Amino acid sequence: MAKAEYGDIIYTKHNLYRHYGIYINENCVVHYDGKLDDMFLRKMCIRETTMDRFLGGKTCYYIDNREAKFNNEEVVERARECIGEEKFNLVSHNCEHFAMWCKAGEPRSKQVYLTLLLAITINSCLNNKGVVQNKMDI
């Protein structure tokens, strides 16, 4: 398997989500980082941390992003310019949004999109079931 390079988007898998960052080197990554006791994600801040802190004992993966708008130097520069930023929002400004903005110039989150799509689909199925049951009762 190929290795991540300077400026690549990397991620690690957690139970319900993936955590994204920008790879600097084998011991350094820029990403949204928080305090371990902050279960409500109120203290998330973009930091440059060790790879061990980013991974938290998990496996590292990287994205071969062919949609890159910026070269690797520019990606790292953009990431480092955001260090200290505390604008984290799970739906509109999360770690995946940050990484995609650094690399592709557009804050996007496939995780958020798929979660919203799933919620809409479930809601639609539940509503359709109710409509069918009501029609049968008439």
Say what each PLM segment does.
Residues 2, 13, 67, 71, ...:
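Short amphipathic alpha-helical molecular recognition features
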Residues 18, 37, 70-71, 98:
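Residues in flexible loops and secondary-structure boundaries
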